[in-house]
Amino acid sequence: MAGPNGDPHVLGGGTGDEGDEGGDTFEEEEYAAINSMLDQINSCLDHLEEKNDHLHICLKELLESNRQTRLEFQQQSKQLNTGADVQGSQPPA
């Protein structure tokens, strides 16, 4: 049986001419195990991607919330400064 790049797999250093059916079974089991591991890795990566997307959304919401809070704080600060300037320019009673 040829490998993924077309090179023949030779088990046990033989030439592959022995007609060993056990070798094909071993290779199939090996490929099945590798496929299973790749499926698990793929599932883990999908899960990580979902968590990353969720985290990204949460961080964007937090950033927007912080921007809103900062703008509100700046507006309040301006109003207080404007009020203090108006009171400071009036003569004391």
From Swiss-Prot:
Which Gene Ontology BP annotations are present? intermediate filament bundle assembly
Query: What is the protein's major site of localization?
Result: other
Q: In this record, what's one Pfam family?
A: UPF0184
Give positions of region: Disordered. Answer: 1-26, 74-93
InterPro entries given in the database record: BBLN_eukaryota
Acidic residues bias locations: 17-26
Q: Which molecular-function annotation in GO is an example for this chain?
A: molecular adaptor activity
Cellular component GO terms, alphabetically? anchoring junction; cell junction; cytoplasm; cytoskeleton; subapical part of cell
Keyword terms, alphabetized: Cell junction, Coiled coil, Cytoplasm, Cytoskeleton
Localization of this protein: Cell junction; Cytoplasm, Cytoskeleton
Coiled coil ranges (UniProt) are 59-80
Q: Does the keyword Transferase apply?
A: no
Top-rank lineage group of the source organism: Eukaryota
Q: PANTHER family this protein is in?
A: BUBLIN COILED-COIL PROTEIN, UPF0184 PROTEIN C9ORF16
Q: What does the UniProt function comment say about this protein?
A: Essential for intermediate filament organization in intestinal cells, interacts with intermediate filament and regulates intestinal lumen morphology.
Question: What family does this chain come from, according to its entry?
Answer: Belongs to the UPF0184 (EST00098) family.
Q: What protein is this chain from?
A: Bublin coiled-coil protein
The taxonomic lineage of its organism, from the top, reads: Eukaryota, Metazoa, Chordata, Craniata, Vertebrata
